[in-house]
A protein has these predicted regions:
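Short, solvent-exposed beta-strand-terminating loops
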Residues: 1, 72-80, 274-277
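Short, acidic Gly/Pro/Ser/Thr-rich loop/turn segments
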Residues: 73-76, 188, 215-218, 280-283
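N-terminal hydrophobic or amphipathic helices/low-complexity stretches enriched
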Residues: 1-20, 38, 62-64, 75-77, ...
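Short beta-strand element of the alpha/beta-hydrolase
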Residues: 64-70
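N-terminal capping segment at the start of a domain
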Residues: 1-25, 31, 37, 43, ...
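Acidic/histidine-rich catalytic neighborhood of metal-dependent amide-processing enzymes
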Residues: 114-233, 261, 265-266
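A non-catalytic alpha/beta surface segment that caps or lines the substrate-entry region
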Residues: 15-62, 79-121
Length: 312
């Protein structure tokens, strides 16, 4: 199955991977795909707060490089999860705004409880009811952000990363020492990658490249922890990126955490790095994700990254 056929299958049949039923259908298809191209696959189930099912391809314990993406999909938000990985003040402002939304939900719930109960019950009872309503209101907003109704479109976040991993399995299957993992429950709090580290302590110290939201944007970002960006493999990727990306009409940037803050699974790994695609010129940003407007998955981006990975 070529990259375009994989893309059409993912977007047409397996774009939603949020419920247990949706994940099971996706896992069954992926296992069949891996068998067809001759790559060993195992589903590792664990429970760290939530049930996670990581999909592991190849021998991660003896691999020198592990390529990853998260396959779970997010809840729908009314406002996009706008992100500026290379601009710390704006990044902090974005996180502050999300926190204020949670606080606002609690305040509105508390205010509503007060409006209903004030004068009808003892002031102490009213105060306690307002406090409880406020806590529950904030918890509800947080719940909806993490595990609310599924976002109907997930082309960039993170069907693009899943497509990249599945296509790379075909392209790189003859390259020794490369394994692949699709993590579960990144959107709920990196629980899948936490489970992987618990199960594969030594493998978790290998050079790791994570792909999260690589489908929508004209600038490729490679970033990671210092331990990862210092590795020879990272230097080869940066050199390949600078050479190959212009052939696809793309630009490149790279840098080390915390100058570049990109919150995804790679942050848990001492030699973790990540690719993402960004928009903009003076300020590089990512938008549309976590909303119904997440419909862009540029095949050009995936083909460019596949060519870059051949140099790893």
């Amino acid at each position: 199955m070529d990259t375009n056929a994989l893309r059409e299958t993912l977007l047409g049949k397996y774009q939603l991977r949020k419920t247990e039923k949706q994940k099971s259908a996706f896992i069954d298809w992926v296992k069949t795909y891996a068998d067809e191209i001759g790559i060993p696959v195992i589903v590792e189930e664990s429970r760290i707060f939530v049930r996670s099912r990581n999909i592991v391809f190849g021998d991660v314990d003896s691999a020198r490089v592990i390529l990853t993406a998260h396959y779970d999909t997010c809840a729908r938000m009314l406002l996009p999860n706008f992100s500026t990985p290379g601009n710390l003040p704006l990044f902090v402002l974005e996180q502050t705004f999300l926190t204020l939304l949670i606080v606002l939900g609690g305040w509105l719930a508390g205010w509503g409880a007060g409006a209903l109960l004030r004068g009808a019950v003892h002031p102490i009872v009213c105060g306690l009811a307002c406090l409880l309503a406020g806590v529950l209101g904030s918890a509800l907003v947080l719940y909806l952000m993490l595990v609310g109704p599924a976002n109907p479109h997930t082309a960039n976040d993170n069907t693009s990363g899943v497509l990249l991993i599945l296509a790379a399995m075909q392209r790189l299957k003859g390259k020794p020492g490369v394994a692949f993992v699709l993590f579960d429950n990144e959107e709920k709090g990196l629980f899948g990658s936490l489970a992987f580290i618990k199960a594969h302590g030594q493998a978790a110290r290998r050079f790791l490249v994570n792909f999260d939201c690589v489908g929508d944007g004209n600038t490729l970002l490679l970033t990671g922890m210092k331990g990862g960006m210092r590795m020879p493999q990272a230097k080869r990727l940066m050199a390949a990126m600078e050479e190959i990306a212009p052939e696809y009409g793309m630009k490149t940037v790279s840098g080390v955490f915390p100058k570049w803050i990109y919150p995804s699974d790679q942050m848990l790994f001492p030699r973790g790095t990540a690719f993402a695609a960004l928009k903009g010129k003076r300020v590089l940003y990512m938008d549309r994700i976590h909303t119904a407007r997440d419909t862009m998955l540029e095949q050009r981006n995936v083909e460019c990254l596949l060519d870059i990975l051949e140099k790893i």
